[in-house]
A protein has these predicted regions:
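Alpha-helical transmembrane segments
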Residues: 28-57, 353-361, 431-460, 715, ...
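Membrane-helix entry/capping segments
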Residues: 1-21, 49-50, 106-109, 141, ...
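Alpha-helical transmembrane segments of integral membrane proteins
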Residues: 1-19, 268-273, 301-328, 332, ...
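Small-residue-rich transmembrane alpha-helices
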Residues: 36-39, 299, 335-403, 444, ...
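Mid-to-C-terminal secondary-structure elements
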Residues: 98, 113-135, 144-281, 355-358, ...
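Membrane-proximal extracellular/periplasmic loop immediately following the first transmembrane helix
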Residues: 48-98, 218-224, 363, 453-516
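Short, strongly hydrophobic transmembrane alpha-helices
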Residues: 16-43, 47, 293-296, 342, ...
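Interfacial "coupling" helices/loops that link adjacent transmembrane helices in transporter permeases
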Residues: 294-338, 708-750, 754, 808
Length: 827
């Protein structure tokens, strides 16, 4: 075999054009598959770092009747489950809350997890530095302690080991607390949500409040459990349903029949990967199609090269070379080609993995921690071996009956090769058609999303996170600080309007509360519960700052203080639903959500409507009719601060002066994530862009390879039929007829490939249409058919023109003498 490899290397070096094309083609196919398999393995196959992950269960409460996929749990509900369910040895709870953290580097707003003392033991996680939160850190009298996540420790604190033992001030809902950094968590999947820090309950005043501890409807906590020894998941599910049914019976006021509260349990691993499984398998299928196209194209090139080497093979056979020796020689060449292609493909796959990990993080948080390991190498090697074996057995040897070499007048043809080449071409066309159809659907969906009007002036609005920092301040003092910030920023050149809100559109999607309410004069239908609406706290000028018109009434003003009448502004959709054919101005709305009755985070009395504003959907990229009630920041609680600046200048030129103004007023004030609303929207659209880019690149590569493959087959066919074309010209056939023959041969292969692609690609297309919003598979398939046909017909025309020129040259050369003899014999 060593001798064969040496001979093969010399042979390939003598054909640099052929070798380069084959290596690059294989590198594209192998690299794409190696990168995507690494992604699939990292997200779907690779074990979690959690100890005994198969016994780690995620317990979810949902309310499908209210459109709530995950309603989370309240502490009384968790207490009932802990007391009654015996299938779990222990439970761990996790809730998410926003903190302003001061004292650990720059002031910043962090997303924090709040856990009980058994959480890390249940999750089976370990520290890389210090220790984790344990039972000794439980209870309201415990000292505040914090564990840093590995990503935050690495990116924000540069892996500084001296942070252990330092104290930070955590400000949030309910007040401020100091907490000591006690450890750094090992790299792990950030589920249920990515956080920067994880604190004990004593670090969050809100979690110590009576509302959090005693109210059954105050739901904000995720629940995990570890199966008890000998217990199975099915047994745990049965017990959970039984206990949950008893809980609903004992507390009917907390479980609305219309909301249809339900309980479910799933292994944490399955829960983490469920959203990514379908899209990753589609991605893997797309990469497999690219590999098929690449191998088919290389097979065609090898077949054409074998025909040119048929004399050599015949001589070797005549000199006694066995079929196994010939096949071994071909295998040596294939191994060298595929090995070089795999090496180049693995190198290119390394940067592809980083891009694909960001893409997959939309569907599974596990992709955030994806790293490149040895699997990339062995996948590339395995694909190279598979391709080498396939390609080595593609050519038929001289002794094959169906592919025997025939000689006639000094020319040779391989009768079996042409049929195989056509099969490979049809395969390439079909695969490229499926990929192109999928890419077309995704691009169409992306363009539709980008063209959607938001109702806001997104390009000229700068949004900056300026969260409320109390740290001993009262609500009135924070409001006064915000007012002064607005006044000073509006004095800057180019600033049109400045205001505060609590939600940055799209960037903070899902963090704003949705609450039940009712309106003066509105009567619920039989069995209808009170409707739900978004709740937002804003400053005067908010609508002008975002470029949103006030349709009726007025905006908030300085007179709408806490000592005055409680007022509200409502959205246009809410006005139409709650006050049909009526003027809502000076009517009243009031909150009825049971959560608000115990938390008292909104004014308890009815609010008089002073204005109606156009809808603002700050959650969805494609705006939907949205019911919203707005409170003035002087009359409502300050959950967080988002600064909006409407400018006629370049929005980003204001970041430095705005930062200087705010820091000059409050050195401890976090100032983060400055960017236009247009960029915030583009960030949300980035997964769709990656969808289009990934599948578009696959489709472009496959189509390019396939078009080259068709052109190669037709070129081979034309060169093999040069003598035939010359004779037909001599006998009176027109060049246009030869042109049509070549065109029809290519069109037949293209049609067969498109039909095969449409048949086998319809189901994946339907899946893609359901998975990616805005895709229409039927229309895209029709358009792609035309595009693929046009691409292949262009290649056919080039080869047809070449056939006519070849035939004319043949006619005017020595072949002309043969043609004259043939004509004389016929006469």
């Amino acid at each position: 075999m060593i001798t064969d490899l040496r001979f093969a290397s010399r042979k390939l070096l003598k054909s640099p054009g052929f070798t380069s094309v084959v290596v690059i083609t294989l590198a594209l196919g192998i690299g794409a598959n190696a990168a995507i398999f690494t992604l699939v393995r990292g997200v779907l196959i690779k074990p979690l770092v959690n100890r005994d992950e198969d016994r780690l269960i995620y317990i979810r409460q949902s309310a499908p009747g209210a459109g709530t996929e995950n309603s989370t749990w309240s502490m009384p509900e968790i207490g009932d489950l802990k007391a009654r369910v015996k299938s779990f040895s222990e439970f761990g709870d996790f809730s998410t809350i926003s903190f302003t953290m001061i004292g650990l580097g720059e002031p910043r707003e962090v997303n924090g997890g709040v856990v009980n003392g058994s959480y890390f033991e249940v999750m089976g996680l370990r520290p890389v530095l210090g220790r984790l939160i344990g039972p000794e850190d439980d209870g309201p009298k415990a000292a505040g302690v914090v564990v840093l996540t590995y990503r935050f420790w690495s990116n924000a604190l540069y892996r500084d080991p001296s942070v252990i033992g330092k104290t930070a001030n955590l400000g949030g809902v309910g007040g401020d607390r100091s907490a000591t950094i006690i450890g750094v968590l090992e790299p792990c999947v950030p589920y249920p949500q990515e956080t920067e820090i994880i604190a004990n309950v004593a670090s969050s005043p809100h979690h110590l409040s009576a509302t959090m501890v005693t109210e059954r409807v105050h739901r904000m906590t995720e629940l995990f459990g570890r199966l008890a020894p000998g217990a199975t998941l099915d047994q745990a599910r049965v017990e959970l349903r039984s206990v949950y049914a008893a809980m609903k019976k004992d507390h009917p006021e907390a479980y609305s029949k219309q909301a249809d509260f339900q309980i479910s349990a799933k292994r944490v691993r399955d829960q983490i990967t469920s959203g990514a499984r379908t899209v990753l398998l589609l991605l893997l299928a797309g990469a497999a199609l690219v590999f098929v196209v690449a191998c088919s194209n290389v097979a065609n090139l090898i077949l054409a090269r074998t025909v040119r080497r048929e004399g050599e093979l015949a001589v070797r056979t005549a000199l006694g070379a066995s079929r196994s020796a010939l096949r071994r020689m071909l295998l040596a060449e294939s191994l060298l080609l595929c090995g070089a292609g795999a090496a180049l493909g693995v190198l290119s796959a390394q940067w592809m993995v980083d891009v694909l990990a960001r893409y997959a993080s939309r569907f599974s948080v596990r992709a955030l921690g994806l790293t490149i390991d040895s699997s990339l190498l062995w996948v590339g090697a395995a694909l190279a071996i598979v391709a080498a074996v396939i390609l080595a057995f593609v050519p038929r040897l001289p002794n094959d009956t169906s592919g025997a070499l025939h000689s006639s007048s000094g020319s040779v043809r391989l009768t079996g090769s042409k049929g195989r080449q056509r099969i490979f071409v049809v395969t390439q066309i079909g695969a490229s058609f499926v990929l192109l159809a999928g890419a077309s659907m995704l691009v169409t969906a992306l363009l539709a999303l980008q063209r959607t009007k938001t109702g806001m002036d997104t390009r000229r609005v700068l949004a900056i996170n300026v969260p409320a920092v109390f740290n001993g301040k009262t609500q009135e003092q924070v409001v006064d600080l915000y007012k002064e910030i607005i006044r000073r920023i509006e004095a800057l050149p180019g600033v049109n309007k400045t205001a505060f809100g609590m939600i940055a559109p799209w960037r903070d999607a899902g963090t704003g509360p949705t609450l039940q309410f009712n309106a003066e004069g509105y009567v619920n239908a039989a069995g209808e519960e009170d409707p739900r609406t978004q709740f937002r706290v804003i400053s005067p000028g908010f609508f002008a700052a975002l470029g949103v018109p006030i349709i009726a009434g007025r905006d908030f003003n300085e007179l709408d203080g806490r000592s005055e009448e409680t007022v509200a502004i409502i959205s246009e959709t809410l006005a139409r639903r709650m006050f049909p054919n009526q003027d809502p101005i000076n009517r009243h709305v009031f909150w009825t959500d049971p959560v608000l009755k115990v938390t008292r985070v909104t004014p308890p009395k009815p609010q008089r409507i002073i204005g109606v504003a156009a809808d603002i959907d700050d959650v969805h990229i494609v705006p939907e009719p949205t019911m919203t009630i707005y409170h003035s920041f002087e009359q409502g609680p300050l959950f967080r601060g988002r600064l909006f600046i409407h400018t006629s200048a370049n929005p980003y030129s204001l970041i430095t002066p705005v930062t200087r103004i705010i820091r000059g007023m409050s050195a401890e004030q976090p100032i983060e994530r400055a960017g236009t609303l247009e960029d915030a929207r583009a960030e949300v659209l980035s997964p769709q862009r990656l969808n289009s880019m990934v599948f578009g690149v696959f489709a472009a590569v496959a189509l390019s390879i396939a078009v080259v493959g068709v052109a190669g087959v037709l070129a081979f066919s034309v060169s093999a039929r040069t003598r035939e074309f010359g004779i037909r010209l001599a006998l009176g056939s027109q060049p246009q007829r030869l042109f049509r023959d070549v065109i029809s041969e290519g069109a037949a292969m293209a049609t067969a490939g498109i039909v095969a692609g449409a048949v086998f690609g319809f189901r994946p297309g339907a899946c893609g249409a359901q998975l990616f919003r805005g895709c229409s598979d039927a229309r895209r398939f029709a358009g792609v058919r035309l595009g693929v046909c046009a691409a292949y017909c262009r290649g056919d025309r080039i080869n047809a023109a070449g056939s006519a020129r070849s035939a004319r040259r043949c006619y005017s050369s020595t072949t002309h003498r043969v043609i004259l003899r043939t004509r004389n014999l016929l006469l």
